[in-house]
């Protein structure tokens, strides 16, 4: 009889858990059903079941997910829930761990958009602290829109009316259809790589929810988020916010309004600069007048006599110090000169040349030039050299005396 492997309950449960965890379809599944047995304990977690005519599915929605839930759940409500299927080991049952829940009448496209919006929000793409201010005076404005739409004409007209001569750079792109998300993202990337653009407007001139779908894609949202310069989204829809609106640094209701945000009125800016310059001039004149008045008061004050007298004392002290330093330097120079003269005299007295000058001579060997100090250092017949004050004698020894 073959050996039978017997599993513990926990081993079988763990095996089933691994099976469910490795099934990608069960990691993010949408389920439609009617709520029953809804419980909401003090922990904030929600426990309920989803059922239809043939089956029941246990569900749990933890407090972190249910806290911001706007939908009022109740027994009998038909909903669509998204979550992960896993086994609850204690009871040995599978259940749905719910991440999001929507009314059953919601379309799948709307559910997918809500899921994407929630995910991007968790990643921080909509955070207010990352929004960048628009430049006060942009040199170049980038435009990402259709080259044939009314939105482009409106933005060009308004920009040039507000600031004649401003440079507008168009990166054309389709704004609806299947290729629109890719073209919009690529246009943003090209403007960013080109450099020199201070602000970018991306948008279109309104339309239905389906027409605006390109601006609700993850590709466009991430392209705006990654753009190194401020972006204004102008999708042209007053009520519904697109993902592009949420990610952009500023949102404008229309392309025309976006142009007004991005481009200042030249005359107003010049007037503002003149006002600032005038304020700065008046402020400087006021400060100079205060300084002039203070100086005049100090000049007339008798209190200046004491500092002036102190200054004279200081100058007198410096003059005396200078004289003492010069005198000390001259004295030390004379002492050093006298010492050098004395040393030179001693050296002169000890010099062999001085001895020769007094009539003496130096006798040395002709080969090595060593001076001879005794007659015992030579023999008769050897040659020697005799050095006089003036000249040299080469001699031969005839006789050596003691």
Curated annotation (Swiss-Prot):
One Gene Ontology term, aspect cellular component: exodeoxyribonuclease VII complex
Subcellular localization: Cytoplasm
Membership in a protein family: Belongs to the XseA family.
Catalysed conversion reaction: Exonucleolytic cleavage in either 5'- to 3'- or 3'- to 5'-direction to yield nucleoside 5'-phosphates
Source species of the chain: Moorella thermoacetica (strain ATCC 39073 / JCM 9320)
Function text: Bidirectionally degrades single-stranded DNA into large acid-insoluble oligonucleotides, which are then degraded further into small acid-soluble oligonucleotides.
PANTHER family: EXODEOXYRIBONUCLEASE 7 LARGE SUBUNIT
UniProt EC number: 3.1.11.6
Oligomer and partners: Heterooligomer composed of large and small subunits.
InterPro entries linked: Exonuc_VII_L, Exonuc_VII_lsu_C, OB-fold_nuc-bd_dom
Keywords: Cytoplasm, Exonuclease, Hydrolase, Nuclease
GO MF annotation, one: exodeoxyribonuclease VII activity
Sequence intervals crossing the membrane: none
GO biological process: DNA catabolic process
Organism domain of life: Bacteria
Disulfide bond residue pairs: none
Name recorded for this polypeptide: Exodeoxyribonuclease 7 large subunit
Pfam families: Exonuc_VII_L, tRNA_anti_2
């Amino acid at each position: 009889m073959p050996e039978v492997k017997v599993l513990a309950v926990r081993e079988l449960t763990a095996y089933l858990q691994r099976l469910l965890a490795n099934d990608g379809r069960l990691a993010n599944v949408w389920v439609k059903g009617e709520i029953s047995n809804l419980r909401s304990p003090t922990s904030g977690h929600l426990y309920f079941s989803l059922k239809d005519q043939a089956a029941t599915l246990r569900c749990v929605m933890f407090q972190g997910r249910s806290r911001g839930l706007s939908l009022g759940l109740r027994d009998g409500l038909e909903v669509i829930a998204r979550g992960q299927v896993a086994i609850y080991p204690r009871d040995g049952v599978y259940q749905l761990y719910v991440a999001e829940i929507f009314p059953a009448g919601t379309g799948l496209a709307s559910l997918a958009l809500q899921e994407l919006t929630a995910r991007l929000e968790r990643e921080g793409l909509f955070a207010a602290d990352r929004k960048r201010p628009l430049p006060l005076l942009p040199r170049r404005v980038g435009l990402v829109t259709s080259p044939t739409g009314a939105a482009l004409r409106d933005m060009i007209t308004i920009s040039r009316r507000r600031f004649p001569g401003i440079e507008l750079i168009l990166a054309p792109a389709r704004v609806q259809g299947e290729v629109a998300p890719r073209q919009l993202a690529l246009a943003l990337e090209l403007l960013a790589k080109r450099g020199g653009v201070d602000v970018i407007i991306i948008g279109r001139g309104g339309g239905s929810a389906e027409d605006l779908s390109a601006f609700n894609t993850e590709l466009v949202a991430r392209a705006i988020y990654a753009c190194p310069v401020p972006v204004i989204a102008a999708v042209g829809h007053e009520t519904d916010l697109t993902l592009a609106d949420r990610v952009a640094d500023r949102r404008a209701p229309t392309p025309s309004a976006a142009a007004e945000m991005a481009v200042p009125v030249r005359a107003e800016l010049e007037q503002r600069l003149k006002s600032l310059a005038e304020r700065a001039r008046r402020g400087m004149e006021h400060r100079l007048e205060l300084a002039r008045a203070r100086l005049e008061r100090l000049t007339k004050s008798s209190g200046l006599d004491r500092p002036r007298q102190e200054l004279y004392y200081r100058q007198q002290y410096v003059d005396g110090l200078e004289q003492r330093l010069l005198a000390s330097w001259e004295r030390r120079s004379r002492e050093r000169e006298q010492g050098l003269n004395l040393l030179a005299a001693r050296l002169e007295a000890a010099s062999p040349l001085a001895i020769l000058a007094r009539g003496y001579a130096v006798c040395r060997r002709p080969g090595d030039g060593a001076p001879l100090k005794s007659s015992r250092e030579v023999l008769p017949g050897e040659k020697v050299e005799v050095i006089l004050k003036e000249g040299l004698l080469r001699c031969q020894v005839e006789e050596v005396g003691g």
